[in-house]
Amino acid sequence: MTKVTTQSLETLVETLSSLTVLELSALKKLLEEKWDVTAAAPVMAVAAGAAGAGAEAAPAESTEFAVTLEEVPADKKIGVLKVVREVTGLALKEAKEMTEGLPKVVKEKTSKSDAEETVKKLQEAGAKASFKGL
């Protein structure tokens, strides 16, 4: 860079630094019109803004789900134990512990289809189960 360019840039920076927020906003609009562009926020900033908007923005659907075992009738415990062992791969002792002191999360970070299938199997065995997005 030449000395003239550097000096003119420094002068420009000083001038811009002295502008008020309203003047900067007006400058932004003028530049958008002159150059036929828009000042779009980066994707991450837009996502953060949408998360902060709460009820205004539609929530994105979860991709990971947790299956919760809520209730097991005493007469259905053996059937539910078999399903818990099948879907979790746990040994008998751990599966038995899983069915006591409910509610307990049986499966975490699983796909929606897998969560639905797991809940269906548990309900068919007589348990009360549900899933929710993480």
UniProtKB/Swiss-Prot annotation:
GO MF annotation list: mRNA binding; structural constituent of ribosome
Gene3D superfamilies in the cross-refs: 3.30.1390.10, Single helix bin
Gene Ontology cellular-component terms listed: cytosolic large ribosomal subunit
Superkingdom of source: Bacteria
GO biological-process terms attached to the record: translation
Keyword Zinc-finger annotated: no
Pfam families on file: Ribosomal_L12 (PF00542), Ribosomal_L12_N (PF16320)
Coiled-coil zones: none
InterPro entries: Ribosomal_bL12, Ribosomal_bL12_C, Ribosomal_bL12_C/ClpS-like, Ribosomal_bL12_oligo, Ribosomal_bL12_oligo_N_sf
Record keywords: Ribonucleoprotein, Ribosomal protein
Role, per record: Forms part of the ribosomal stalk which helps the ribosome interact with GTP-bound translation factors. Is thus essential for accurate translation.
Family: Belongs to the bacterial ribosomal protein bL12 family.
PANTHER family xref list: 39S RIBOSOMAL PROTEIN L12, LARGE RIBOSOMAL SUBUNIT PROTEIN BL12M
Subunit structure: Homodimer. Part of the ribosomal stalk of the 50S ribosomal subunit. Forms a multimeric L10(L12)X complex, where L10 forms an elongated spine to which 2 to 4 L12 dimers bind in a sequential fashion. Binds GTP-bound translation factors.
Protein name, as recorded: Large ribosomal subunit protein bL12
Organism in which the protein naturally occurs: Chlamydia abortus (strain DSM 27085 / S26/3)
Gene encoding the protein: rplL
